[in-house]
Curated annotation (Swiss-Prot):
Pfam family, one: Ribonuclease_P
PROSITE patterns: RIBONUCLEASE_P
GO molecular function: 3'-tRNA processing endoribonuclease activity; ribonuclease P activity; tRNA binding
HAMAP family linked to this entry: RNase_P (MF_00227)
UniProt protein name: Ribonuclease P protein component
Organism: Shewanella amazonensis (strain ATCC BAA-1098 / SB2B)
Amino acid sequence: MTSYTFTRELRLLTPAQFQAVFTNPVKASSAEITLLATPNTQEHPRVGLTVPKKQVKRAHDRNRVKRVIRESFRMHQHDLPSLDIVVLVRKGVMDLENPELHKLVDKLWRKLSRRFNG
């Protein structure tokens, strides 16, 4: 049975892990969200989220965005290659409802997979 949990091993935790992604990333982006990714040595993808206060003012809105992105990653983790992924959120994300945001992030996961799998 395939596990769809979102454990600590599936997250980027330290500044060094984030910095490794920022040095030489492959990008997949839309107007509201950018994904930066680099291959990792793990056997699974890992994700880190940045939702700046400057772009998304209220804490409950930042939490909503992060929750939707984490849930989307959790459901697509087995479709993604072994990558370290940083999700950058821009201002326009506040205009999206949860289903629209989920659909957008799903599309970006597929785009990123195609770039690494050929």
